[in-house]
Amino acid sequence: MSRPIRVALVAGEASGDILGSGLMQAIKARHPDAEFIGVGGARMEAEGLKSYFPMERLAVMGLVEVLGRLFELLGRRRQLARDLIAAKPDVFIGIDAPDFNLGLELKLRRAGIKTVHYVSPSVWAWRQKRVLKIREACDLMLTLFPFEAQFYDAHQVPVRFVGHPLADAIPQQADRAAAREALDLPQDGPVVALMPGSRGGEVARLGDLFLDAAIRLRALRPGVRFLLPCATPERRAQLEQMLASRDLPLTLLDGRSHEALAACDAVLIASGTATLEALLYKRPMVVAYRVAPLTYRILKRLVKSPYISLPNLLAERLLVPELIQEAATAEALAQAVAPLIDGGQVQTEGFDVIHRALRRDASVSAADAVLKLAGRD
């Protein structure tokens, strides 16, 4: 009788903890006695992960913070590699966190352990030479999006497109009436969601712009109301300060971004992962982004993709307007959003096709691929 399958996983942040816990559930459905070791958060630990150290020790953002913790991170990776090689798992899964996980995967693969990387870095957009390291470090790449799988196929990296868990979780048809009731909004009349980002720097660059665009939009559509979900108390305080000098029928929400998307008719949104959520809720959108001029010049040279927003990358065409840098003025944003409030059918039809393509029971698909690689399917 064979021993229980032993699976090692490392997640470095909350989104990875969610993906990891779903994957563990799907593996346990096939192998109830599976053993899980590695690094994860509360969700993965609840599924039975024995975590070598708190996941928060890996959750660093920004160059300065990474440099300040570099010796600790490298030391933890060396020790983790030793511990995992000694534990001899059937397979290792690095969940996102590529700067930490790819180096770990390389060491483990050289020691004879099968390695999987779950969630592709943005190699298709920039720093494409990273694919050489990925090819050396990974036995298998699991991607959330089909265009990523096409990129890896072209570079001879074994890959499986598993779909996106959000596409499984968000219904094909969101209930606008129920969402408006939950948010104490009237059932009639246009509602626009403003989503200028979740980080302080994004809100500093886009918050005033989005609020000025809302004022212009109000002149074009006098009855329109606005919702603005705040990711954290800090973002709420930042936005309250911006709102103090403006007279707008706007409701600030603590979190509740999914309810805001379900309740609204259209969205003005910063480029980022929230655009995928807006797409899955089938809400017509205008995407805007501004970065520091020097950053933009550098990115313009490095980025190989023709689009910046996920909806357009997934559609492989200009499905949603993208207003970037100087083009993102309050007037231009208002003019772009206004016709979408009751006329965004071309966008929503495209979103529906994409949602169906991404809905593949991602955790089960990922578990199938992992177990097949480990020879325990």
Swiss-Prot record:
Molecular functions (GO terms): lipid-A-disaccharide synthase activity; phospholipid binding
Biological role stated in the UniProt entry: Condensation of UDP-2,3-diacylglucosamine and 2,3-diacylglucosamine-1-phosphate to form lipid A disaccharide, a precursor of lipid A, a phosphorylated glycolipid that anchors the lipopolysaccharide to the outer membrane of the cell.
Pfam families with a match to the protein in the record: LpxB (PF02684)
UniProt-recorded name of the protein: Lipid-A-disaccharide synthase
Metabolic or biological pathway, per its Swiss-Prot or TrEMBL entry: Bacterial outer membrane biogenesis; LPS lipid A biosynthesis
Known EC number: 2.4.1.182
Catalytic activity of the protein: a lipid X + a UDP-2-N,3-O-bis[(3R)-3-hydroxyacyl]-alpha-D-glucosamine = a lipid A disaccharide + UDP + H(+)
Coiled coil: none
Entry-linked HAMAP family: LpxB
